[in-house]
C-alpha cells in the first residue's frame, strides 16, 4: 500500500470490504436456503423474510417500469466515487468520518451489486411489532444507516474535516 493510502482515510476501506463480505454472504445464505417470500420467525418482533426490492428505500420507485434500476445504479456509482475521493482527502485519524464514509460506501456497493446483477436488491431483515411492519432491509442498508448516523454525530460534535495534504 502506498504512503498516501497509509496516511489517508483510504486505510479505512478495510471496513467497507468487511461489510461487503458480510452483506454478500448473508444474501447468499438467504437466497440459497429460502424460497422467495418465505419467512422464518426468530423472535416475536423479528424474522428473516426473503424479498426483492426493485426500488430504493421503502420500495420507492419500485413500480417505475425498470428505468429506476439504472438511475439508482448511476447514483450509487457517483456516490461511491465521491466517498472514495473524500476518504483519500481525509486523514486516517479522523475516525468518525472515515468510518461513516466507509460504511455508506459498503452499503452503496452492496446494493449496487444486487441491482446490476439481478435487477433488484435482496432484502431479508424484517422487524415488526403486532401489525406495524418496518420495510424489509439488508446488511447494506444497515451500513448506510449507521454511516449516516455517524455523519450526523460528527456534524454535531466533531471538528471541521481537515483535508490531508500529500
Swiss-Prot record:
Documented EC number(s): 3.4.23.36
Residue positions of the active site: 123, 141
Annotated compartments: Cell inner membrane
Gene Ontology molecular function: any one: aspartic-type endopeptidase activity
Membrane topology reported for the UniProt record: Multi-pass membrane protein
Reactions catalysed, as given in the entry: Release of signal peptides from bacterial membrane prolipoproteins. Hydrolyzes -Xaa-Yaa-Zaa-|-(S,diacylglyceryl)Cys-, in which Xaa is hydrophobic (preferably Leu), and Yaa (Ala or Ser) and Zaa (Gly or Ala) have small, neutral side chains
Catalytic class of the enzyme: hydrolase
Primary location group: membrane
GO cellular component entries: plasma membrane
Biological process per Gene Ontology, one example term: proteolysis
PROSITE patterns: SPASE_II (PS00855)
Pfam family, one: Peptidase_A8
Pathways involved: Protein modification; lipoprotein biosynthesis (signal peptide cleavage)
Keywords linked to the UniProt accession: Aspartyl protease, Cell inner membrane, Cell membrane, Hydrolase, Membrane, Protease, Transmembrane, Transmembrane helix
Transmembrane segments: 11-31, 42-62, 67-87, 90-110, 133-153
Family label: Belongs to the peptidase A8 family.
HAMAP family on file: LspA (MF_00161)
Protein function: This protein specifically catalyzes the removal of signal peptides from prolipoproteins.
Protein's recorded name: Lipoprotein signal peptidase
Amino acid at each position: 500500500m502506498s504512503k498516501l493510502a497509509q496516511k489517508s482515510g483510504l486505510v479505512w476501506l478495510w471496513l467497507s470490504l468487511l461489510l461487503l463480505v458480510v452483506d454478500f454472504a448473508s444474501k447468499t445464505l438467504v437466497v440459497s436456503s429460502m424460497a422467495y417470500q418465505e419467512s422464518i420467525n426468530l423472535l416475536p418482533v423479528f424474522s428473516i423474510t426473503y424479498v426483492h426490492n426493485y426500488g430504493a428505500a421503502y420500495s420507492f420507485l419500485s413500480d417505475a417500469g425498470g428505468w429506476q434500476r439504472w438511475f439508482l445504479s448511476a447514483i450509487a456509482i457517483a456516490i461511491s466515487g465521491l466517498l472514495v475521493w473524500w476518504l483519500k482527502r481525509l486523514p486516517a485519524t479522523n475516525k468518525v468520518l472515515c468510518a461513516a464514509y466507509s460504511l455508506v460506501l459498503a452499503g452503496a456497493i452492496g446494493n449496487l451489486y444486487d441491482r446490476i446483477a439481478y435487477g433488484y436488491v435482496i432484502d431479508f431483515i424484517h422487524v415488526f411489532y403486532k401489525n406495524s411492519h418496518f420495510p424489509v432491509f439488508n446488511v447494506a442498508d444497515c451500513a448506510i444507516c449507521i454511516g449516516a448516523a455517524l455523519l450526523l454525530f460528527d456534524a454535531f460534535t466533531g471538528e471541521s474535516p481537515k483535508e490531508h495534504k500529500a
